[in-house]
């Protein structure tokens, strides 16, 4: 492999290059922000399919961005302006990761956004954080206009020449 790449003037990075056995679904690899792994079918035992979802690094990155946009220092701002700043971040991240098997990760990100906005509202209105689940439900988040990632996953469709 190194000889073929050498003729093309390419070199493999020894720290980043590793051989992964995908059979059996025991391990996977991260590439371009996605974690790729063979996953066994729930309907057909013994049949594996390659699936991809956002990697741990990608999840940590979006959590850090959400945390920055909902910091305690922003409690003096109106929530609609916080949401206006947060929505483009969520839209862009969701547009990149919506192709694949990202549904479960999208639910995690949505619940994290909900939690952070509730904490920010509780700090803003000087309420106890234990009471946030009663007052700040998902309907409240929807009324704020927060972009929801849940339900935005798109699956690849086969191309048809005559359609």
Residue spans for each PLM region:
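Non-catalytic terminal/accessory segments
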Residues: 1-163
């Amino acid at each position: 492999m190194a000889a073929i790449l050498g003729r093309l003037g390419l070199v493999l990075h020894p720290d980043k290059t590793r051989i992964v056995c995908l059979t059996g679904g025991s391990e996977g690899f991260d590439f371009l922000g996605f974690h790729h792994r063979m996953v066994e079918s729930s309907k057909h035992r013994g049949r594996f399919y390659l699936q991809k979802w956002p990697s741990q690094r990608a999840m940590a990155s979006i959590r850090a961005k959400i945390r920055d946009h909902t910091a305690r220092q922003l409690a003096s701002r109106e929530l609609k302006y916080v949401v206006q700043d947060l929505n483009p971040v969520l839209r862009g991240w969701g547009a990149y990761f919506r192709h694949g098997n990202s549904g479960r990760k999208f639910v995690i990100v949505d619940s994290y956004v909900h939690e952070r906005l509730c904490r920010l509202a509780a700090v803003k209105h000087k309420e106890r954080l234990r009471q946030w689940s009663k007052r700040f439900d998902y309907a409240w988040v929807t009324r704020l206009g927060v972009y929801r990632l849940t339900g935005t996953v798109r699956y690849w469709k086969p191309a048809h020449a005559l359609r």
